């Protein structure tokens, strides 16, 4: 896959532009599915008494996650179905060989669209072009996104292999598209013709511009020799980046100290690393050095361990500097001043200078809190100045003091009120209250899921219309990837009548959405493919017998689940007509906003009172415990939150500094000198500059590859989310207010990536907001970035 020219550079031009991350319908004939008269068939269990059905669904939602016996009974209702369906209802994926068929059918459809676009000559054909190319993107996404997910999540090696082959086939074809200059020429011809663009919808114009930008970044317009250089550089960057991420190593593998100087560290650990001559070898990677920095009383030992854990090997630094050099050359070849300029041109920030304005303003808005935190640690240390290797030690002392308090002990009971089913119930109730959509558990057909533990939820609106499908794979199992994530398996999109007719001429069982969920839009009467989402977490499984506790979540896990459901909500409500801009397919520095904002709802008292109940007694979480939770968050935030924020800001500043290097300076990059310049200028507790060798923490900063020039995005979205929380949801007072929810939905969520992010922010805050006087935020630019920096990040520390 390293041969694909765009992978290391930016998102794939023909596929997902998303964030870093992703009722059994009776089979109907295509004519029925597309017919407005059959609208009730699309979502087939609209109850006669909505409130009774709603209450029943609400209770079922809790029980399918909390009770294994209930789940087994619920999921077996459709076990008698003789004909199995395919994975996620995809009609091709009933066995491993189905992946090949799925890829081949999709490939043939792609080739037909490419032939149509290349042969276009009439005004009507050029007017179809944006929609045709969006469908081409969708066909590729259908295979690539789903295969990429299944090859990682499915337990059967045969299915993994088949999915990998389907993925590779479509990826290879995408490489062909990237070098098909005729597609670029035809699209540019269409986009420059006023008789075409005046006919296009706003969505079509946006998608055309996105694709033109992607083509330009794939070197398609360059002479053959330059294009080959571009391909070679891209391949080099891909290889270097992969090596950089996977080969991080310290300059020294261990620090040898006197065993007696490790007082404070767990004696069992000391025994493990003790040597025969009364010394001990403290490793410089893993958990032991982190524990040593928190607990060893001897400052000299902490200093040695700290410096060693932040000093990279020279090989790793060479990898990074070569990566940065080749990225600078790639940008120059593409006509940009730097890699940062190239990467940011289609983001909200637009330029490295604007990002630096934002980050510098953020340092200022955070500085007072940092000094407040450090002054308390300095008071604990006493005479000599606080050093960077002191921070973890004194923070740990403060946390220990706090954790011995009565309130902290009281909070150990909080997870009893957060069974997984209860939290899912809370999410559904919150979505219903704010946006008029809710989660309804649905039986799965044989073959529909990759593991028996996967629950399916249908998302329905207030008219009981089916609008999305979520597959929840939330329980731990051997060899499962532990990191929580949201995956878009299929994007929302309008299916044209031509596609329906095309299916009718194929095999009798062909379906315009491959058998996956569809619905008829009540306004336009057109058929739509519904977003299909997978939510993956790693929570403890409830006991098989049903006796004992269900899966109980910590407050952190609750926030994580709300975060991932924030991404899902963007996919659910951002249902555009074209898939290239649906849901989370928006600018990278806007994609985390819905998920970060959702975290704020998780522990807001008005929201907690809607769902937090004891798993055994059904008693609601008391107001006093809610207050204790809030005080606990504030206490921890005031101990280390601002310093955590500063660390994230510094990482983003380092990322910008590295990726703003022009090509003519790329031959002599000293990444360590740049790191120390940024740290000395902006850090309140910088690494010393006189240690030999100097610290080189940048060698451990793996995100420099995957998030090159965009690491600021997460904290940028945090600042915007904080502002929306404070001003639209009134710092929680309007957390369950429908008017606030509708405003946020209509100004932000429903657009997906089909509206400039600054217009979304200006729209949701409103022109009466002082930060957006006269709607000035809509213009974006340097001053808007500075303004967001002034909003700050609050005191919670880095969440998620």
Curated annotation (Swiss-Prot):
One GO term (biological process): peptide metabolic process
Cofactor dependency: Zn(2+)
Keywords attached to this entry: Hydrolase, Metal-binding, Metalloprotease, Mitochondrion, Protease, Transit peptide, Zinc
Region Disordered, residue ranges: 27-59
Catalysed reaction, written as an equation: Release of an N-terminal octapeptide as second stage of processing of some proteins imported into the mitochondrion
Highest taxon, organism lineage: Eukaryota
Pfam families, alphabetized: Peptidase_M3
GO MF entries: metal ion binding; metalloendopeptidase activity
Record note on cofactor: Binds 1 zinc ion.
GO CC, any one term: mitochondrial matrix
Binding site for Zn(2+): 563, 567, 570
Record-stated family: Belongs to the peptidase M3 family.
Job description of the protein: Cleaves proteins, imported into the mitochondrion, to their mature size. While most mitochondrial precursor proteins are processed to the mature form in one step by mitochondrial processing peptidase (MPP), the sequential cleavage by MIP of an octapeptide after initial processing by MPP is a required step for a subgroup of nuclear-encoded precursor proteins destined for the matrix or the inner membrane.
Protein name, UniProt field: Mitochondrial intermediate peptidase
Source organism of this protein record: Aspergillus oryzae (strain ATCC 42149 / RIB 40)
Organismal lineage: Eukaryota, Fungi, Dikarya, Ascomycota, Pezizomycotina
Gene: oct1
